């Protein structure tokens, strides 16, 4: 087991948060989300597995929640489980079943792109080096199943905290997370790599020198642009939606800054999600005039859009910005599929469908394969049953009605969820 310079600081903060209660642990977990490359512990004996700060903070919340649950049960008190938690629990159970039984049932019956580190396999294309291996149990089945179970338990614990503290507390957690994400993005944009090295401890490939058409990609506290772009688009979506409903300057600042950083991450998936969410918000502005959209937000949007249109017009007419923009869009969007990276990801996606076919719709096991795109990962790993459970969870978590006081926050959460799903 390896510790890092940041490890004692983290464990000290975790101990203090544990003493203060579950709400502080939830706030700390949210604060750790932007530190996507900050490992607190590394396990060389398990293939160099990095335990991230966010995961350990979530585990702390789950542990405290488990103690409270056990106390209630020992006292004979009833425990209510939300339908969304039940659906996610069924997904987690099937994930465990697939990672322990199905991966052995179909071992040697199909070839997959492995998640395991350092496994090259048999090359299937001259365009990329990643190859296929015969399906079989690996350490990634254990690690990925652990993350699924942790996510389920975290959702249950976080739900209980929000029921006690109110949905507004969840928004406060997101404010903290978004602010930290912007600070880390600013440090990365300023080239403060020596300072960021303290939190870049995970055993991941660091892509902090990547650029597109000479423009460096911003990755913040994450290992690469796609992760940073996806997370930052989430914050843009939530606070953009929040600003339309509240007109608060705070929401506008966070949304605008997050949108800018998501744009300069130059991540294909992040940009697609950013455009998609922007269109959703614009449609809400048009449809909600005089209704659900705050008047202050409408005035601000009108001023901002006019200023942006003038600025873009000036840049396109009097500078070479148009050529640079077209080159970036062409590389990230239109020629992406024909690049080696695009070919690789297309092969990963097809690999997920092949695993679904070869497992007769059951899936080859959580952590058994590398695929691309949420739906392909789900279908290949946990099959039709697991995918159905996950979709049921999404519907139950975001498709229902909230109390009048929390309706606006639910709308914001739905917008953020759309951003995450598109970015995946």
Regions found by a protein language model. Give the residues of each.
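Membrane-interfacial entry segments at the cytosolic side of transmembrane helices
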Residues: 79, 166-174, 247-252, 290-306
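Membrane-interfacial helix-loop-helix modules of multi-pass inner-membrane proteins that assemble, modify
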Residues: 102-134, 166-168, 179-222, 326, ...
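Loop-to-helix entry and N-terminal half of a specific, functionally important transmembrane alpha helix
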Residues: 181, 391, 400-424
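TM-adjacent membrane-interface loops and short helices in multi-pass inner/ER membrane proteins
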Residues: 98, 331-375, 382-389
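A membrane-periplasm/extracellular boundary helix in multi-pass inner-membrane enzymes
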Residues: 46, 93, 188-196, 281-336
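Transmembrane signal-anchor hairpin modules in multi-pass inner-membrane enzymes, especially those
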Residues: 1-122, 298, 407
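Alpha-helical transmembrane segments of multi-pass inner-membrane proteins
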Residues: 8-18, 145-157, 171-200, 210-215, ...
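Interfacial loop-to-transmembrane-helix boundary motif in multi-pass membrane proteins
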Residues: 25-26, 77-92, 136-187, 413
